[in-house]
Amino acid sequence: MGGKWSKSSVIGWPTVRERMRRAEPAADGVGAASQDLEKHGAITSSNTAATNADCAWLEAQEEEEVGFPVTPQVPLRPMTYKAAVDLSHFLKEKGGLEGLIHSQRRQDILDLWIYHTQGYFPDWQNYTPGPGIRYPLTFGWCYKLVPVEPEKLEEANKGENTSLLHPVSLHGMDDPEREVLEWRFDSRLAFHHVARELHPEYFKNC
């Protein structure tokens, strides 16, 4: 009567059904491609390399040698609140990000590593504009970008073996406000979505 679909033992369906049931919503503040992934389970034709900067950036990375394959080894998915909190605490525990001088290249490497190993589409690590502290748009990500004090910069630039291409020596060339920024962990960001309060206009389509 119902044809082949009436059989409850359709191959793989119980697993897929369970995955759908457990799927978490995308975190507030992720980009358009991740919102697509949440709603449709895939990136649709409304987000292509021609129309979406994050998709174009990701496509360009496939041409570059970044030290690991760009194609994720796990299913593609949007960053969730829980995943952002867990990732923040994992990085805090392992060390290496706290106090690291921010540069776009370093952020790209982090985004690609997370995309490759965890499958999270790299449009979630965005911050409020400057000057001053930049708060994460994605709720659950507990790292903000904080301007480095001038004394600390001076100290870091002393000595003959300072690399001119090191982010601390570039004097904020990556930043529209010309500020040198560092990643700083703040556990309160897991409970307080500062970016949404400061810039509600960024969240109209969420």
UniProtKB/Swiss-Prot annotation:
It is found in: Host cell membrane; Virion; Secreted; Host Golgi apparatus membrane. It is a lipid-anchor. A motif (Dileucine internalization motif) lies at residues 164-165. Gene3D superfamilies: HIV 1 nef anchor domain, Nef Regulatory Factor. The keyword Membrane applies. A lipid is attached at G2 (N-myristoyl glycine). It comes from the Viruses. Residues 148-180 are annotated as: Binding to ATP6V1H. The modification Phosphoserine is found at S6. Residues 108-124 are annotated as: Mediates dimerization, Nef-PTE1 interaction. The record marks M20 as: Might play a role in AP-1 recruitment to the Nef-MHC-I complex. Residues 62-65 are annotated as: Acidic. Residues 69-78 are annotated as: SH3-binding. Belongs to the lentivirus primate group Nef protein family. Factor of infectivity and pathogenicity, required for optimal virus replication. Alters numerous pathways of T-lymphocyte function and down-regulates immunity surface molecules in order to evade host defense and increase viral infectivity. Alters the functionality of other immunity cells, like dendritic cells, monocytes/macrophages and NK cells. In infected CD4(+) T-lymphocytes, down-regulates the surface MHC-I, mature MHC-II, CD4, CD28, CCR5 and CXCR4 molecules. Mediates internalization and degradation of host CD4 through the interaction of with the cytoplasmic tail of CD4, the recruitment of AP-2 (clathrin adapter protein complex 2), internalization through clathrin coated pits, and subsequent transport to endosomes and lysosomes for degradation. Diverts host MHC-I molecules to the trans-Golgi network-associated endosomal compartments by an endocytic pathway to finally target them for degradation. The N-terminal domain is composed of the N-myristoyl glycine and of a cluster of positively charged amino acids. It is required for inner plasma membrane targeting of Nef and virion incorporation, and thereby for infectivity. This domain is also involved in binding to TP53. This is Protein Nef.
